[in-house]
Regions:
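Conserved donor nucleotide-binding strand/loop of the catalytic core
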Residues: 45-65, 69, 73
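Catalytic-site signature of metal-activated, phosphate-bearing donor transferases
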Residues: 65-71, 89-216
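Short beta-strand/loop segment that forms part of the nucleotide-sugar
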Residues: 9, 30-38, 55, 84
Length: 352
């Protein structure tokens, strides 16, 4: 089956990632467009071996301009946007075709799995991102952290599609800092030209996290949350959780407690419930912490892998162990399955 979908990518100095990315796409038989924005490594050479078309675009400090140029080069109206460090994990082509036939004016949301570490154990955070759309109705806007809008400037409806990507996302510390410094300049320009919005403040917060300036990240998240932000917005939900974890990292536990004031608005997410459990635990309010962690385990879905199961149970077990209630601790450590920190604690308790 060859679907009328063109994969459109922009790239610069991505020879560490682009080959794996393009190899994973090959079985799908999508048309592949690569637009290079000034590579000095082997990116173009590799792209020419795998892609159907390779173009050059003079970088102008505008991601949307580069993205929109890439989709103009496609042979198909349906375009799938991916980055070079995103590797295809799962796809159902029959369901994908059916979904596009039903949703011609909407944006398809892929699943992107992002690796991260917690308590020294590698885990996954999953998110839905709008990446598939018909170029007759939509395009990109925004010079940085570009977003999909309809051609008349509205936010399009969305639909879920059976496409999952793994986000490798590894960048050296120096490369991460260089990228964050560049992005900061573009984000501040966007803020000045377009005015404040939850989206821009959230991205500024994330950018300052990349620059290891958590105080600045907190400041921008606070500004975003003061804009009467929609609690049903995925960006706003992520901003609340980012804000909370930054406060915990900064040991500002008393300020983090203020998130109780918006509990009702955000309590539909396991991620927020788990965060509240962490906040109560850091403040020594252990009964409330256990209550929130237990509540998190009642949710069927979450963004950060394990917070509705083994991570929540591990924290409950840790609290019971610290309180000297070893039987309860053992019970909850066992609920963590093969989660390495829990297995280790069970062995240490048995040996004590």
């Amino acid at each position: 089956m060859m679907l009328p979908i063109s994969v459109c990518m922009i790239a610069k100095n991505e020879d560490n990632h682009i080959e794996e990315c393009l190899k994973r796409l090959k079985p799908c038989r999508f048309e592949v467009i690569v637009v290079d924005t000034g590579s000095v490594d082997r990116t173009v050479e590799i792209a020419q071996r795998y892609a159907d078309k390779v173009f050059h675009f003079a970088w102008c400090n505008d991601f949307s301009a580069a993205r929109n140029f890439s989709i103009q080069q496609a042979s198909n109206d349906w375009v799938l946007i991916i980055d070079c460090d995103e590797y295809l994990e799962n796809v159902n082509l029959a369901e994908l075709e059916e979904a596009t036939n039903r949703n011609s004016h909407s944006v398809g949301m892929i699943v992107r799995n992002n690796p991260y570490s917690i308590q020294g154990v590698r885990s996954i955070m999953s998110e839905r991102i709008g990446r598939l759309f018909n170029r007759r109705y939509c395009h990109f806007e925004g010079i940085i952290h570009e977003q999909v809008f309809t051609l008349d400037g509205r936010e399009p409806d969305s639909f879920q599609i059976p496409l999952t990507f793994y986000h490798e996302g590894y960048v050296s510390e120096s490369g991460k800092r260089m990228r964050a410094t560049r992005n900061l300049e573009l984000l501040l320009h966007d803020l000045e030209s377009k005015g404040p919005s939850p989206f821009i403040y959230y991205q500024l917060g994330q950018n300052y996290i990349s620059l290891n300036d958590l105080d600045k990240a907190v400041q921008y998240c606070q500004k975003g949350l003061k804009l009467n932000a929609d609690p049903n917005s995925a960006i706003v939900q992520s901003m609340v959780e980012t804000y909370g974890y930054c406060l915990l990292e900064l040991a500002k536990y008393d300020i983090a407690m203020e998130l109780q004031d918006i509990y009702t608005q955000f309590s539909q997410r396991a991620d927020f419930i788990y965060l509240m459990g962490m906040i109560y635990m850091k403040n020594g309010i252990y009964d409330k912490a256990i209550e929130e962690f237990r509540k998190a385990t009642t949710f069927s879905t979450c963004s950060r892998k394990g917070i509705n199961s083994y991570q929540a149970n591990y924290n409950i077990a840790s609290i019971y162990e610290n309180m000297g209630e070893l039987e309860e601790a053992r019970t909850y450590y066992k609920k963590c399955g093969d989660y390495a920190p829990a297995v280790r604690r069970l062995k240490e308790i048995a040996a004590s």
